[in-house]
Regions:
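Ligand-binding face of N-terminal immunoglobulin V-set domains in extracellular IgSF glycoproteins
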Residues: 107-112, 120-124
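Short acidic/polar inter-strand loop motif in beta-rich domains
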Residues: 127-135, 242-251
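Short, aromatic- and glycine-rich surface loops/edge beta-strands on solvent-exposed regions
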Residues: 84, 119-127, 235-244
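Short amphipathic, basic-aromatic surface patches that mediate peripheral association
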Residues: 74, 180-193
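Surface-exposed, short loops/turns at beta-strand junctions within beta-sandwich domains
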Residues: 112-118, 228-235
Length: 254
């Protein structure tokens, strides 16, 4: 009898370990009623699993709903992932970015986002045909997407528009770049305003894109991004961006 059970047990163990079925088998750790909607919208039919290796950190309560820092650490997938998505489930524009690591991008970054109301925040990392999902919940008074920011209320906003500040630091296994771009990042959700936001970001090495991001208007005004790249201190990077009005920005990272 034992001889017949061994093959059956082996098949059952393989089936239970398969990442393709864990999305349905696992309970949503954030217990969000919007999870299934955005799983289908952003992740499609690709297998999905909740994974503690995708670590998402944010303040438990957002004191400034227009500037909420999100830290993502999925270093376990460094060199073995093809895309990363970040979305805020209850924002009117839920998707924040679509990150493609290409040759140099690593799965460790931070960015400031808008928060319209208390919400679950998700990060999905595509690795070897499976979406690995982590997340957290942020409470807040909200209004970050529909309240005017300060960028255009200051007299000097047009003077500073497009100004870039960038630095690079040693950070194993490569280097950490920090970039701040002066831009209003208007969502178009405020009456009498049109969408005006950065939509494409790239880190350039040796004249070629080394990592890229597609942004949405849920990124905070005067966006700040920190990203770990493979290149060490000898690598030469440029930061390039383009907004939806065709303005282009270019800056060498020292």
């Amino acid at each position: 009898m034992a001889g017949y059970l061994r093959p059956l047990l082996a098949v059952l163990m393989l089936f239970c370990a398969s990442p393709g079925i864990t999305a349905e088998a696992q309970k949503d750790p954030l217990d969000s009623f919007m999870w299934e909607r955005y799983r289908e919208r952003f992740l499609g039919d690709t297998p999905v699993r909740f994974d503690q290796r995708v670590r998402v950190q944010a303040p438990a309560f957002a004191e400034d709903s227009g500037q909420v820092p999100i830290d993502v650490d999925a270093s376990a997938f460094n060199g073995r992932f093809q895309r990363m998505l970040l979305w805020v489930e209850l924002n009117p524009i839920p998707l924040v970015f679509d990150y493609r690591p290409l040759s140099d991008g690593l799965a460790n970054l931070s960015i400031n986002v808008r928060l319209e109301q208390s919400s679950a925040v998700r990060v999905a990392v595509l690795s070897d045909g499976v979406w690995h999902v982590g997340g957290t919940r942020i409470e807040g008074e909200g209004g970050g997407c529909t309240t005017p920011g300060i960028a255009k209320t200051e007299d000097n906003w047009s003077r500073d528009f497009g100004k870039i500040m960038a630095r690079r630091f040693d950070h194993e296994p490569g280097s950490r770049v920090r970039v701040k771009l002066s831009h209003p990042m208007d969502s178009g959700l405020i009456p009498s305003t049109r969408p005006f936001y950065v939509e494409q970001v790239a880190f350039i090495r040796d004249g070629e894109p080394a990592a890229t991001m597609a942004w949405q208007a849920s990124v905070s005004e005067n966006p700040e991004l920190a990203l770990t790249l493979k290149g060490d201190s000898d690598a030469s990077y440029r930061f390039q961006a383009r907004d939806n009005n065709g303005n282009e920005f270019d800056h060498a990272i020292p």
